[in-house]
Every structure is written in structure tokens, then in C-alpha cells.
């Protein structure tokens, strides 16, 4: 378990590793759906509010999982979604997605 996750386990989950791992697994399952939603939103380039909500949710989940080194990217994505600069939004999304794939061992094609 990465150090950042150990910190979250201790500080937010009271060292309950079963609870933390169950939460982490559920989040990883949801990330696949989040990736699909983000891809659809980027193609449509219409729903800034939905992209902002997605980024906000990811920011919170990443913080809760202990990945405070990645969550600022989700926050930047949330702010960019409010401006709807779609090329910058796509750039930030691809960066965040790549960091999440690496951090959680996700399938890069999902």
C-alpha cells in the first residue's frame, strides 16, 4: 500500500484496513464509469456543469483515498470546467486520468 494510502487509512479510516480496501475497491469500480462519462462529455463539449460535478467528486474521493498529490489536478479540472475552455479541459483530463491509471493500477484502455 502506498504511503499516501497508509496515511489515509490511519487518519480517515481509524486503521480499519477492511473498510479502507472496500471503499478503495468501490472507487476503482466507479473510476471506469467516470472515465467513460468524461470521454462522452469531452466529445459533446456541452455540459460544463456535469464535468464540474465529476471533477469535484473525483477531487473528494482522491483526497479520501489519500492521494492528495493527484487531487489538485481534479480541482484544476473543476475550475476549468466552469470556464469551458474545452482544449484545456481535455489536456487536464488526460493528465488526471493518466495519474489515476498509474496510482490505482487501472487499465489504461478503460
Where do the language-model regions lie?
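Two-component system phosphorelay core
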Residues: 1-110
Amino acid at each position: 500500500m502506498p504511503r499516501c494510502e497508509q496515511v489515509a487509512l490511519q487518519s480517515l479510516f481509524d486503521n480499519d484496513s477492511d473498510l479502507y480496501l472496500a471503499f478503495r475497491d468501490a472507487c476503482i469500480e466507479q473510476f471506469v464509469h467516470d472515465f467513460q462519462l468524461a470521454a462522452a462529455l469531452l466529445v459533446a463539449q456541452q455540459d460544463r456543469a456535469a464535468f464540474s460535478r465529476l471533477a469535484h467528486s473525483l477531487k473528494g474521493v482522491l483526497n479520501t483515498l489519500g492521494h492528495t498529490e493527484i487531487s489538485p489536478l481534479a480541482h484544476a479540472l473543476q475550475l476549468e470546467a466552469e470556464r469551458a475552455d474545452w482544449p484545456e479541459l481535455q489536456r487536464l483530463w488526460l493528465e488526471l486520468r493518466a495519474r489515476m491509471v498509474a496510482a490505482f493500477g487501472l487499465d489504461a484502455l478503460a
